[in-house]
Structure formats: C-alpha cells, structure tokens
Amino acid sequence: MRKLDSNLMHAALTALLEPKEQYQFPVYVGFSERYLSSLEQTYGFLAVTTHQRLLVSRFGLLTVPMKQQAFALQTLQKLSVRQIPLMKTRKITMQFQSTGKVESLRCFCSSKTFGMGLPNQEMQLQQLLETLNLWSTRSDLE
C-alpha cells in the first residue's frame, strides 16, 4: 500500500502536466461528495499551473488512483471558502463551467499535515486560494 506523501503528490501532479508546464502551490486535500460514507471518501492533491489550470488528483482507500482532472482557471465560476469552527480546516467549494457543462468540486484542506512530508501546507494553501480567487467570477472567502 502506497502512502499519500510528497513523492506520490509529485508523481500524480506531474502526470497531469502539459509540455513546458509546471505546477505551483500543491496541497493535500480530502474530497467530499454528498451522501458518501467514510469508506467512500477520497483524498488527494490540488495545484495550479503555469498554464492557468487547476490540477486535481484523487485517490481512494489504499491509495488506489480514482480520478485525475485538470480545469482551466478561466472556467472557474464560483469559489467558496469556509473555515470550519474549532478546527484548522477549510471547506473549499468550486464550480467550473465549460462548454455548457457544470462541474462542482468540494474538498477540505487542513493547514497542517503530519507524517506526509508536506511542511509548507499552510503557506501553499494560502497561495493556492489567492490564485483561485483571482480567477473566480464569484468568490466567497472567509
């Protein structure tokens, strides 16, 4: 069983890159869809790129790759970031619209990760959110 760590993050995000593209501000997140049990929760990574894209890499239980996606940042229609009370976790909801199709993404991101080799999670998260806010047509940051 592979561990979700900085090595897996780098490999997963690099696999989504276009030629001459680099990723920036990578963070570890938990993804949430409505009505899923805890066994169906997925985890993974988000990062923005030098080609103005959001990379999304999801892994299921036992680090099985689930879904790899990339969204053009100019298709970001809505961004909502909420601080969860009593926790250092943010709930991030994004909505992308491209060619008439709307896709929503909801994830949770903690400012600290332990045992994953991601010492700059808090700083990377702040920079990622600032970048997403620049591109969203409607944002609700808390």
Regions found by a protein language model. Name each.
Residues 1-51:
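Anionic N-terminal interaction surfaces
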Residues 18-20, 73, 98-100:
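A short, structured loop/turn motif at beta-sheet edges
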Residues 35-45, 50-92:
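Phosphoinositide-binding peripheral membrane targeting modules
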Residues 92-98:
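Short, acidic/hydrophobic/Gly-rich beta-strand patch recurrent on exposed beta strands
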Residues 99-123:
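Canonical phosphoinositide-binding patch of PH/PH-like domains
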Residues 122, 126-131:
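Short, charged interaction patches at domain edges and termini
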Residues 130-142:
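Mixed-charge, glycine-accented linear interaction segment located at domain edges/termini
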